[in-house]
A protein has these predicted regions:
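Membrane-anchoring/interfacial helices and their immediately flanking loops
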Residues: 1-23
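Membrane-embedded catalytic scaffold of the fatty acid hydroxylase/desaturase
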Residues: 17-153
């Protein structure tokens, strides 16, 4: 029974993480927001995209997940220990996968993910995003662009 609970929470948090990834990338990194520090838009939309600075705004460290995800961490603590541990596991997975995919896509490192067929799809998806920054916001979870109708073929 505990395994089923773990699987259910992993599924819930993976879907939540996919929507959070898409939302943050689309609505905070590609639009100036008065309530956010200016560097968020500047580093991503201007330096990384327009000036093609592939060394800026690449990594997504775990502390960012902890900071931004703190309301979810607090809520999951009150739900159950399994909810909390699976959320933290999903945060670790996403931080690692985003960083490795993004570093590989921008030729900053050669890693094991680059040998997968998923990497080829993610690279193509992300390169289209750089050509048309208003499309293809998913980095780890490519399917979110189909869901929100922002996918370029």
């Amino acid at each position: 029974m505990i395994y089923l609970e773990i699987l259910v929470w992993i599924a819930i948090w993976m879907v939540a993480m996919a929507i959070i990834e898409y939302s943050i990338h689309r609505w905070t990194m590609h639009r100036k927001r008065s309530w956010l520090p200016k560097w968020i838009f500047q580093d991503h939309a201007i330096e990384h995209h327009k000036k093609e600075r592939n060394d800026i705004n690449i990594d997504l460290p775990l502390y960012f997940h902890i900071l931004v995800g703190s309301p979810l961490i607090i809520a999951s603590y009150f739900i159950s220990l399994i909810s909390l541990l699976t959320l933290l596991t999903v945060f670790m997975y996403h931080s690692y996968t985003w960083t490795k995919l993004h570093r590989g896509i921008h030729d900053l490192e050669n890693n094991w993910l680059m040998k997968t067929s998923y990497f080829k799809r993610a690279k193509h998806h992300h390169e289209l995003h750089h050509e048309r920054p208003g499309k293809n916001f998913g980095v780890v979870f490519l399917w979110t662009d189909s869901l929100f109708r922002t996918k370029l073929k």
